[in-house]
Amino acid sequence: MKILLFITGHSQINEYFLFSRFLKTLYLNNNCDIFIYCNNTNISKEIVTYYQEFSQKNKQLFITTKNGGYRTGGVEAVSEGFELGIFKEYDYVIHLHPDVFITEDEYLVTILRENLENDTVFFITKSNQDPTFFSFDFFIFKPKLLTTNIFLENLYTFTESPEHYLHNMIMKFNIKHSFIKRFNNDNWDPRRIDENLKLWHEHDLNKVVNELNNRNLL
C-alpha cells in the first residue's frame, strides 16, 4: 500500500510540529509519504523547522503564491496537487489540514487495507447533519481510479462551501464513494477526538499540547 498524506494549510505553524508528534506513534508513520502544501508565501520560516520534524524519507514542503482565498484555497490546493501529478503513483491520498491530528490509526489502516482492491474511489466522513456536507478537512481518495480532476471543475465559480462542492462534484461525475464513520452523531460540535477514526480537528493548541503531555509525547 502506497499512501500519501497531503496536508494543506495557510497560516498554520506549530500545528505541523504537534501533528508530527502524534504521527510518530502510528503505523502510518513508517508507511506514508508527506506532502505539505502551503498557499502563503509570507509564512514564517519556522515552517521549515517543523517540516523537518517529520521522519519520512520522502517528504516535500511546497509553498506557492497561488491562493484562491479562504473559501476556494483548500479546493484549489487539491486541484493543484492533481495537476502537478503529485498523486498518480499512490494507492491512497489522505487529504487533511495540519490541525486535524491523527491521534490513533488502527481503524483508519483497517479501512485502507480492506478497500485496497475494490473500485471505491472516495472515502468520506460526515461532521454535519446536512446530507450534502462532505467533510473537507479529511477525506481519502484513490488517485489511480480518479481519471478526471473533479476539483478543477467550477473551481473559481462555485459559491458554496468546500464541503458542498466536494459533494456536488462527486455526484456530478458519478464517482463511487463510501462513508467512513467518524463522529457517532455525525456532528463535530463540540470539538473532540472523534469516536471512530480518532481524528481531532482542534484549533486550541493548548489543549493539543496538554493531550500530548498526557501521552508522554512531548
What residue ranges belong to the model's regions?
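Catalytic core and acceptor-binding pocket of nucleotide-sugar-dependent glycosyltransferases
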Residues: F136-L218
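Active-site-proximal specificity loops/subdomain of glycosyltransferases
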Residues: Y37-K88
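Conserved donor-nucleotide/metal-binding helix-loop-beta segment in metal-dependent transferases, i.e.
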Residues: T103-F133
